């Protein structure tokens, strides 16, 4: 089958790789000059299945009000003048219940755990290198309230059989030796030893090269204007003055997926703006070993070979990609507070990207009501974590194979009806 994939981020490239490996003829189209040059370029670098969780959580609405008045708030909202933003925020609010949080987190952990397994198999098969580490993820708490609040996440981890360790402030240094110097600031931590880290942009670039060896064709610097429809199916992709045709089409354009498919299927994917800095390491003994999540500021601090990546925050501000110095200040404050002297933040590069977020946090992977149109988008802050699993899952669905995990509640159809009790539809 001839397949056109729109988007060459980590999710689009992973889809291309697994579809090509399944025997399909694949072409990837992207407006950028190469793979992973937009949202996948400088994310936090963590591969954290156990920490896969929706931003829509109990208590978040009240916290959002409090964060409006805080200098280093992890969430900010600025109206963009669209009705879609208001609808999306209302849908997110409806998912901020204990029941919905558990349901959505369970779906996300299922896909994320599977994706980690797919990544490990890929690494064993291809020996792909991307500055990866397998040192786990450590979430640190600054207050007893935060530590107690982790109980709801631990319950989901137990149900999903995800290994975890609950650490006291004195035990944190076992996982991250550099935290010994600041243990007095911390109450404890939750460690997931099965998590990994790695440079997403480097991984995507090298996976694209492996995909090319399987026959995948990449068309970069190509504008994607519209999907042409005929007879109730996609007839082609309008790219400037050219119509690109195939048998099936995959939209993996992240936040830009929504507008492209708007006339065919309504998907609640909104851009959630995030920031990162990447600083050179100056003292490895004072730097993190793997990924550390600061629960207070919702910031991830990740170790690469000779760099520290610090990423986080969420701004609901539309497609605004302006860099804000205040956000850089928050990232620098956080890493210097937990790992003083580890990296040179004055020499750090500053970046922002738009994560494609659904109101329930769960990505949209699979078929649509249009017979030959498929989606692989809406992964939010977890595109890197979920990429390989989403790609393999989509390849299985498009090849007529039974997926290794449940997939029906990951498709866009969960938003199209709220009457099917078995599917436990999302609020959208």
Curated annotation (Swiss-Prot):
User: What is the native source organism of this protein?
Assistant: Burkholderia pseudomallei (strain K96243)
Q: What is its EC number?
A: 1.4.99.-
Q: Which residues bind FAD?
A: 3-17
Task: Please state which protein family the record places this protein in.
Answer: Belongs to the DadA oxidoreductase family.
Q: Which cofactor does it need?
A: FAD
Cite a single Pfam family from the UniProt record: DAO
An example of a Gene Ontology BP annotation on this entry?
A: D-alanine catabolic process
For this UniProt record, the keywords arranged alphabetically read as follows:
FAD, Flavoprotein, Oxidoreductase
Q: Which one of the record's GO molecular function terms can you name? A: D-amino-acid dehydrogenase activity
What lineage does UniProt assign to this protein's organism?
Bacteria, Pseudomonadati, Pseudomonadota, Betaproteobacteria, Burkholderiales
Designated name of the protein: D-amino acid dehydrogenase
Q: What does this protein do?
A: Oxidative deamination of D-amino acids.
């Amino acid at each position: 089958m001839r397949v056109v994939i729109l988007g060459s981020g980590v999710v689009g490239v992973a889809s291309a790789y697994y579809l090509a490996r399944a025997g399909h003829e694949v072409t990837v189209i992207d407006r950028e000059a190469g793979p992973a040059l937009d949202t996948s370029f400088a994310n936090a670098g963590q591969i954290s299945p156990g920490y896969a969780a929706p931003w829509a959580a109990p208590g978040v609405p009240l916290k959002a009000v409090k964060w409006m008045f805080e200098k280093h708030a992890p969430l900010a909202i600025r109206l963009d003048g669209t009705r879609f933003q208001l609808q999306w925020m209302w849908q997110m609010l409806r998912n901020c219940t204990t029941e919905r949080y558990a349901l959505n987190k369970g779906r996300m952990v299922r896909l994320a755990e599977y994706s980690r397994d797919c990544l490990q198999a890929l690494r064993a098969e291809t020996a792909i290198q991307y500055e990866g580490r397998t040192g786990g993820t450590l979430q640190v708490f600054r207050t007893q309230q935060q530590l107690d609040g982790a109980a709801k996440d631990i319950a989901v981890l137990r149900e999903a059989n995800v290994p975890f360790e609950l650490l006291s402030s004195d035990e944190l240094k076992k996982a991250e030796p550099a935290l010994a110097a600041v243990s007095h600031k911390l109450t404890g931590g939750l460690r997931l030893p099965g998590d990994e880290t790695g440079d997403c942009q480097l991984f995507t670039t090298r996976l694209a090269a492996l995909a090319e060896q399987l026959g995948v064709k990449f068309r970069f610097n190509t504008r994607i204007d519209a999907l042409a429809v005929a007879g109730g199916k996609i007839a082609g992709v309008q790219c400037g003055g050219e119509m690109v045709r195939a048998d099936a089409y995959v939209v993996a354009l992240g936040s830009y997926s929504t507008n492209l498919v708007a006339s065919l299927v309504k998907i609640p994917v909104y851009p959630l703006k995030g920031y990162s800095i990447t600083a050179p390491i100056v003292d490895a003994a004072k730097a993190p070993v793997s990924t550390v999540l600061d629960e207070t500021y919702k910031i991830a601090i990740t170790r690469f070979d000779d760099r520290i990546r610090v990423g986080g925050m969420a701004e609901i501000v539309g497609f605004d990609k302006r860099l804000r110095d205040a956000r850089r200040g928050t990232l620098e404050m956080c890493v210097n507070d937990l790992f003083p002297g580890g990296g040179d933040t004055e020499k750090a590069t500053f970046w922002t990207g738009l994560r494609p977020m659904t109101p329930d946090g769960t990505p949209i992977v699979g078929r649509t009501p249009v017979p030959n149109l498929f989606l692989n988008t809406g992964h939010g802050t977890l595109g890197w974590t979920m990429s390989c699993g989403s790609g393999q899952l989509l390849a299985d669905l498009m090849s007529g194979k039974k997926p290794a995990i449940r997939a029906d509640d990951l498709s866009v159809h969960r938003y199209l009806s709220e009457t099917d009790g078995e599917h436990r539809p999302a609020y959208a």
